[in-house]
Structures are given as C-alpha cells and as structure tokens.
Amino acid sequence: MKASRAKPKRAPAAKKAAAQKKKHKIFTPRRTRRKVAAKRASKRKPNAQAARKAAAIASLPGVVVGGRIGPRYAEILSRDALVFLAGLHRRFDGKRRDLLAARSERQKRFNAGELPDFPPETRHIRDNDSWRVAPIPADLTDRRVEITGPVDRKMIVNALNSGATHYMADFEDANSPTWANNIEGQINLKDRWQGQIDFTDPHTKKRYAIGPKPAVLIVRPRGWHLSEAHLTVDGEPISGALFDFGLFFFHNAKAQLAHGSGPYFYLPKLESRHEARLWNEVFLFAQDTLGIPKGSIRATVLIETLPAAFEMDEILWEMRDHIVGMNAGRWDYIFSFIKTFAKNSNYVLPDRSQVVMGEGFLGGYASLLVRTCHRRGAFAMGGMAAQIPIKNDSQANAAAFAKVRADKEREVRDGYDGTWVAHPDLVPVAKEVFDRLMPQPNQTDRVRLHVRVLRDDLLKIHKGTKTEAGVRLNIRVGVQYIDAWLRGRGAVPIYNLMEDAATAEISRAQIWQWIKYGAVLEGGVKVTAEFFQRALRQEMQVVKREVGAANYARGRFPEAIKLFRELSLSREFVPFLTIPAYELMLTGSFG
C-alpha cells in the first residue's frame, strides 16, 4: 500500500473560498487585488477575465453550467452562445423526447415479433422519380477519402494535414464526452477557423501547423439519445446533439462561409424520417437565428440503424434542402441489427468477424444505400477502415494494408463515392484505390436502377460460426474500450485497430444475445452466464499481462468489468452502453 501524502492544512478563509468555488463551479482568481509584480499581474489578468465571464454565465435565467470553467471555457460558453443553446433546447427538446419515446414503442413491437419494413404510408415518396436533393457545394463534390477522429488539438492538425479530402471531427463515438473533452474540442475547432490552431507539443516540443491545403472540416455531434449533464436549461439537461451542434454552429458558421466552405455535419444514430425532420427543423431555426441563408448547413446522415435503412428515401426527402449524402456506418449497423432482434431467436449472428460487407443483410444494405443516394443526386459514402500501422511487424502490416485495399476496391465497384479511414497512414492507401478506379470526382451518375433490394434482403442472416475465441475477443476488446472511455479516451488502439464505441457495443451485444439464446460454440460448448463469467475472469488476466500490471492498476478496470458484466447479463437488452457509462463517469455508479 502506498504511503499517503499529508496535505497542508488550509486557513479558514482559504477553506471558505474553496467551498464557494466548488459550490458554484466557476473559475476564480487565485490572488486578491493587492498589487503584485507586473509579471504576476499579467498571468492573473486572463483568470480574472474568465471569472467575470463565468459570473455572467451564472446570471443567465434558467441556464446552469455545472462544469468547471477552465481557461477559455467562458469564450465558448459566452452569454450569447448560451442564449442560442437555450433557444434550441426550449424549442426542440420536447420533440426529441417524443421521438425517443417513439423508438421505445417501435422496439416493443419488434420484441413482440413484428419485422421492420418499408413504411406503406410513404410509398409515394419512394416511387416518385422526380425529386432530388439540393445541389452539392463545391468543396463537397469530391470526398474520396475522409479521415475521422476525436477533437483533441493534435488530432485535428494531423487530420487536416493528412492528405484526406475531408476530416470528420467527432464528438460522438470517437470521443469520450468528458466536460473537458467537449469544451476543449470546441475551442480547438474555433481556433481552426480563427487561424490559431497551430501549436507546439509541450512534451515533445514538436511544432504542429496547418498546411496549405487542409482537409474540409465536417463535425459529428452526439446522437439524439444522449444528454449533456453539465448544462441544464429550466432544470433539464440539454441534448448532447443540440449542445455539440449549437456551440460549433454558433461560433464557426459565419467564419466557415467567409472562407468559402460551410457548416457541414455528420448526423449519427437516426432511426426514422421523423428524426431527420427534427434535424431539418433545427437547421432552419439555427440559420434564421444567426441570419445565415437557408441551405448553408449541409449534412451527411449515417445509416447505421436497421430501422433507418427502411426509410432512406424518406430521410433524404425530409432533409432535401440540407442533405448531401449518406454513409454506410457498418459497425453500429450490426449492433442495431442485434438490438432490433433482441427478443427474436431467428436472428442470432455468428462471430462479428464473419459479419462482413457484401454478404447477408450488409450486402442488401450496401446496395440499397448506393442506389437510393445516387437516384436522388446524393453521395454514398463507404465505411471505416479501422486498421492502424503495425510498426514492429512488416509482414502483418502489409497484410493489414492489403485488407484495407481490397475493402476499398469493393466499395468503388459497388458505386461508393468515398470512404473513411481512422489513421493518416491509410489515407494514401485508400486514395490510390479511388484515384485508380474513380478518376472523376464522384460516381453519382451510376444510378443502378436495376438494383432491387427487398425487405428480406435487409434481414438475411450471415452464414458463419460461433467460436469461443470470438467470445473471448469480445470480452477483451469491450472491457478495454470501456476502461479507456471512462478515463476520457474515445478512440482506442486495441489489437492493431482503432476502436470506438461502436465496437464495444457490438462486443457486449453479441455476448448478451448468445447467452440469452444459449448459443452453442464450435466444439460443443454452450454459452451460459457461468461460462461467460469464467471467461471474463480469465480474459482479464490476459489483459493485465498485455497492458502490464501497473497500467492495469492505474486504469478503471474494476468499473469497466462490472459494467460489461451487467450489460452482458442484463435480463433486458440495454439500448446503449454509453448511457450507463456516462452515469458511471459522472457519479461513480450506474443503474
């Protein structure tokens, strides 16, 4: 046991000041107003300014900022920005909650045996060949390689300089939504448009600066189901989606337009045309409030839920003045498939490594997305290549890159207009494929009207096996990811792949499904709660050896293990692991 370090006693006045600071969660100067040396005064000045701004924040009626106000936080959480956020919340949060309730009701029908299908009441939208989405902005017409990642300063500069055509700055699956990550990410993105993003790493002393041709910036806010607990409006936490979107749009939209670009977004986790309609209403309100022309906001919708796959035309229709394309978010889509059929034993999947694009329900989904988008003049974006360089094994690295190359060649042949990568070293690999097979900016002219995808094509189970190795890999990956997420990291390298929340969701969902239906693995072992708990204990010893005992002890593995266990053994399927994980992050407990 480490010896505890004695803390110096505080004077009564200091205790009182500390208590007040904790109570109000605002940044206060460390010193009083007595005269000090000019050097100390210059250091104190921005702190005093932050305190004055924080006091202004605290006086805004109905709005409470519960997170600390660190350096430059008040610049993002300005009074005008908070008024804008409050307006978004008061106008749209009720509708958001109604839509989340509608999700729950729809899931009850699926649990009772109903199968997803194309809505008969919107057949006229799907059958009408005359409508198209609005013309695509010039800097979105060639999106052959997009790099994605979290919003820390180093990642932003490296992504902008990566050679990719576009960079998706992610507040969602690749971001752990700590208060610091969210606000400092907003500071970093604002600095990009103010020309102040260049910096020197304090540890390595390496200089980072944006090059002459940076990637076009696109931002992904959180999904409709997540909240931002550190900001409440009229006593309710604001939607994470409105928080992320609102702050970025408020601070950057006009600067983006002035630079010849625009406020561009990726929208995650939509499940219906009604949820798309809500985003469209948010866009109209935001543009009108800031005096920005209608249609300035442009969005790409990730089709990463099974219900949304049956409403692609309808989503494009609802957002036709603001949408530019759709993306095949394959990892979350697999998770959504498991969740949709949580109570249906006819849809138990094989090892997730065997659920591949081009086959089963993913094959139908991929074909339908391209056909639907191109028919409406929108882009079809391919999925993520999560591989990262394997520095100590050139043969394994070459094999990994060959796998990426083959996947991107499939995407081009299928008609996709661009793709995603998670690491800068994969940009030239993907770019070479698209340059070779798609010399023009895009292939939206490949309409593929001959393609017909029916309901059963979107529900076709992949053939494959269930293995003990698959169970154990799911355990190791899922727990390691949750541990990192709880410590503030949302994009995590695990076994030579850059993992985000989607992989953790698949991992725990597949184990839950196999336990519930007593899946029999190759070799005859039946997946039971007892088998899972034994494997969990064994695999955590493997993880401890892999990461090292010291790193394991410094992590949050006990909490991650408990959460992973409870999600996997829960009687009812928990819709999103990030909801109890966020509660755990904030309070130290969940449930």
Predicted features and spans:
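Arg/Lys-rich, intrinsically disordered low-complexity tails that mediate electrostatic binding
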Residues: 1-54
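Expand to "…catalyze enediolate/carbanion chemistry for C-C bond making/breaking, isomerization
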Residues: 39-40, 52-591
